[in-house]
């Protein structure tokens, strides 16, 4: 699930559709590639402008939690029925790669130390919903495929980017990789010297 960007003012019904898709496909793992929560109240790009007025952190958090409620509703309904019938429940492993939008919380507490302890990633309740979180700019490898919100390059730690991002990722990382962040689909396949496809 790439870059869902749950935010106040947007319809979260799309999360129900994604939850239903998960129930139809029944994957062993569900990986969110980050930016589940948009957190516009913590944006540094347009802070201080008239367009920024009215944004509230609490509303951002409530939108992200509502999105999770909607996403997990089909799974919850399914498992309640299975529990009633004493049948095996479906419990996929859930991975949440934190993205740059979730990192807005960390940056806010670093630039305004008085917020430290008052706000945090835990407000989004990811772990309560069963997600195993992967820190921002970190990766997790499942079945030989590495997942991250984005991959970095160079000493500045900037995101790898390109018009042909799939090609750039396999060329720089030399492994099978999936990332979010760009909001675009791109795919490339290479063959390593040992014959393995990446």
Regions found by a protein language model. Give the residues of each.
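Short gly/ser/thr-rich secondary-structure transition/capping motifs
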Residues: 12, 128-131, 157-161
